[in-house]
Amino acid sequence: MKRVMLYFGSFNPVHKGHIALAEYVVEQGLCDEAVLIVSPQSPYKRAAELAPEMDRFEMAERACAASRLPERIKPSVVEFLLPKPSYTIDTLRYLTENHGAEMEFSILMGADQLERLDGWKEYEKILEYPIYVYPRHGEQVGRFAGRITVLEDAPLQDFSSTEVRGRIERGEDVSQMLDAGVAEYIRRKGLWSPAARKAALTAQIAAEPENTELYTERGKLHYRLNEWGAALNDFNRVLQLDDSHAEARQYAQMVQEKLEFRYKDIYNP
């Protein structure tokens, strides 16, 4: 029977740390194949944070193909085909019912996911599967002792997908974090560029016109791009909705100072 380890995640984007973990579990003989289950939309994440699902899958496909074990590390679209929202137990149940005769499934997850596991749908059923957990640097994993296996010597990277997205948005180098094919795909598609991020936030604001955090995030993006007028408009909108919003007030004051300095008439102080 083939042993298949399922690595669930949004992979937004997939980075070298994800692939290093997949290579590790295969090379350590913990499974015959590692499969990256690309989530269409996490029940615990805002939809606006995610790149389109097929973009995330294609990046995962490129990263897996460039791994040391391309025949044994693969991505899957199975959760794209199941009813939404996507929950881990539903995917496990579907795979077991349809492939359990020839495959034995286990799960790979991070210690941060394990900490939240008891909030997941039917988490006790999930614990019936073998679970392998990779801790963060220097972290002790104490939850569900005896029901999980901690991978103490798993390879860990000092960055996350969140950091990768932030660096892309700021135009910083990500070559040490991403496979070259993934980086090229992101550049070609314009994923997580400032323009793409602004468009996503604007669409989300249209759907949630009183969400102060969305205006704040877009305002900070305008601020980083030196778009002072647009930034001030967003921060003022936040203060209209919530006069006690300290972060928006601080940013609005900083923008006002920049505008006053820029347009001050030095001949008529």
Regions found by a protein language model. Give the residues of each.
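Alpha-helical linker/edge segments of TPR/alpha-solenoid repeat scaffolds
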Residues: 197, 254-269
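Nucleotidyltransferase catalytic core that binds NTPs
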Residues: 1-197
